[in-house]
């Protein structure tokens, strides 16, 4: 699907019956979560809540509608990435693999393809525009008040309203390009949020470099809310370091990404999507009393994609100096909870992008699956064509180290090519018949683990397990290995022809 911005995407979804409007007042405090959870589990449409309830106005409703469940099905994720189906996402993975590690052409034809790909990337370089739509309205001074936006409180035990789909734009002092990341943000005052980014994420790395290079100076940040789907999805896709997320978004969308410079002078190096619905401009301010030298606050607890409330922790405070927006802006939001939720659906879709990337590095991999029940990234199932003893273990460690997205994968199960990794029954059969626990499990201690994983003994540091559920080769066992049972193909073909009439004859005749 080709589209210009979020509004165009919404319009096309509505024409396809993939989006419904709700005019009845619905509260962003818990009610939207429950409605969207039911819609997502039923494979239902995206929803535009036109009159969010609860604002301190005579009507008791916000003037800003809420867009939710936008990526509630893999089909809509595919449409957002410029594809028509989930299967088409493999092609996007192939493009990324070619950009990540291009191979020398073996002839003029391949050279032509490589040139065409390079030209298409070059042609999608983002462009700066003047008078962007995202700056049609500007809030400054006391007008900057997050309470004027219908920010969701998703679960009963949540600490405060939470910004969920904010596209955070940062730039390190030594970086050539900006980083785009999606980090949740707890509202703590009219113009302050807690920026919850994990230590290895791009935004946190940019902030750390800034603090070292410019101690005591505010760190500039812009947050785009309601960016177009390609830009949002580009921020969570394993884009090569040599390619900007904005450029990749242009490839997905089929048109160059229009960017706007921020109005705050100290944010001059940051660019935001010109079509974004709402933009927050501000800084992480210095605090000489904090060990880091910058303002921090205690974040959480919040219900998360694990299905649990996470523990509290300290993160930087983002102070908002200015809010810009389009006329009649739309607030894009989501919730996270026990799978399935939108991150789980995104995980299933992005899984198809990962497969060609992995196969480029490890041609022996024939399929790869991140089951959504495993919180989309904590368990990986790998199907491969095994070629030698120890091969499965090599692949395990390769997957853990190849992409940053698999840094937090706790469990990897490797099976042979005769096992469907997308069928739990087959995976369990392989584990229970081909695994000796002492020989075929690998435990790795003191590895990076998701901070939200309370099962790890130390926050952010824990162990990983690999399970080799492949047939064992000489050197891996001294016993005769079992042969799988299968019917004679000729008999199967004969019975296929018999089944249609075999049970038509009445009993006893």
Curated annotation (Swiss-Prot):
Its cofactor is prenylated FMN; Mn(2+). Binds 1 prenylated FMN per subunit. Its EC number is 4.1.1.98. Pathway: Cofactor biosynthesis; ubiquinone biosynthesis. One of its GO terms (biological process) is ubiquinone biosynthetic process. It is an enzyme of class 4 (lyase). It comes from the Bacteria. Catalyzes the decarboxylation of 3-octaprenyl-4-hydroxy benzoate to 2-octaprenylphenol, an intermediate step in ubiquinone biosynthesis. PANTHER family: 3-OCTAPRENYL-4-HYDROXYBENZOATE CARBOXY-LYASE-RELATED, FERULIC ACID DECARBOXYLASE 1. This is 3-octaprenyl-4-hydroxybenzoate carboxy-lyase. It comes from Cupriavidus pinatubonensis (strain JMP 134 / LMG 1197). The gene is ubiD.
């Amino acid at each position: 699907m080709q589209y210009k911005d979020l509004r165009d995407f919404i319009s096309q979804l509505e024409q396809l019956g993939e989006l419904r409007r709700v005019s009845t007042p619905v509260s962003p405090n818990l009610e939207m979560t429950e409605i969207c959870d039911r819609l997502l589990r039923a494979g239902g449409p995206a929803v535009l809540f036109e009159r969010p309830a609860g604002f301190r106005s005579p009507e008791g409703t916000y003037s800003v509608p809420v867009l939710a469940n936008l990526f509630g099905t893999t089909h809509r994720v595919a449409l957002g990435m410029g594809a028509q189906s989930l299967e088409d996402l493999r092609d996007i993975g192939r493009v990324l693999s070619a950009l990540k590690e291009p191979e020398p052409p073996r002839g003029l034809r391949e050279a032509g393809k490589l040139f065409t790909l390079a030209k298409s990337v070059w042609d999608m370089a983002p462009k700066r525009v003047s008078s962007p739509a995202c700056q049609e309205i500007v809030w400054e001074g006391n007008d900057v008040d997050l309470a004027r936006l219908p920010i969701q409180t998703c679960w009963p035990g949540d600490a405060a309203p939470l910004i969920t789909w904010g596209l955070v734009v940062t730039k390190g002092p030594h970086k050539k390009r900006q980083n785009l990341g999606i980090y949740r943000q707890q509202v703590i005052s009219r113009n302050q949020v807690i920026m919850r980014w994990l230590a290895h994420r791009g935004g946190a790395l940019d902030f750390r470099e800034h603090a070292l290079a410019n101690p005591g100076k505010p760190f500039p940040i812009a947050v785009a809310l309601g960016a177009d789907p390609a830009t949002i999805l580009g921020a969570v896709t394993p884009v090569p370091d040599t390619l900007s997320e904005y450029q990749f978004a242009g490839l997905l969308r089929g048109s160059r990404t229009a960017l706007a410079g921020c109005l705050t002078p100290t944010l001059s190096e940051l660019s935001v999507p010109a079509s974004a619905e709402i933009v927050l401009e501000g800084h992480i301010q210095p605090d000489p009393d904090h060990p880091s030298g910058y303002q921090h606050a205690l974040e959480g607890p919040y219900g998360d994609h694990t299905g649990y409330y996470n523990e509290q922790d300290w993160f930087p405070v983002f102070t908002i100096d200015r809010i810009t927006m389009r006329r009649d802006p739309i607030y894009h939001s989501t919730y996270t909870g026990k799978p399935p939720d939108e991150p789980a659906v995104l995980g299933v879709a992005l899984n198809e992008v990962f497969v060609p990337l992995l196969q480029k590095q490890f041609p022996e991999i024939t399929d790869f699956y991140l089951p959504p029940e495993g919180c989309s990234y904590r368990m990986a199932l790998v199907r491969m064509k095994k070629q030698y003893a120890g091969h499965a273990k090599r692949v395990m460690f390769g997957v853990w180290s190849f992409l940053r997205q698999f840094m937090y994968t706790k469990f990897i199960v490797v099976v042979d090519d005769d096992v469907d990794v997308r069928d739990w029954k087959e995976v369990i059969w392989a584990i229970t018949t081909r695994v000796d626990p002492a020989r075929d499990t690998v435990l790795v201690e003191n590895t990076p683990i998701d901070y939200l994983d309370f099962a790890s003994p130390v926050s952010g540091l824990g162990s990983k397990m690999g399970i080799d559920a492949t047939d064992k080769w000489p050197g891996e066992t001294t016993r005769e290995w079992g042969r799988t049972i299968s019917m004679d193909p000729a008999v199967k073909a004969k019975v296929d022809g018999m089944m249609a009439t075999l049970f038509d004859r009445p009993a006893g005749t």
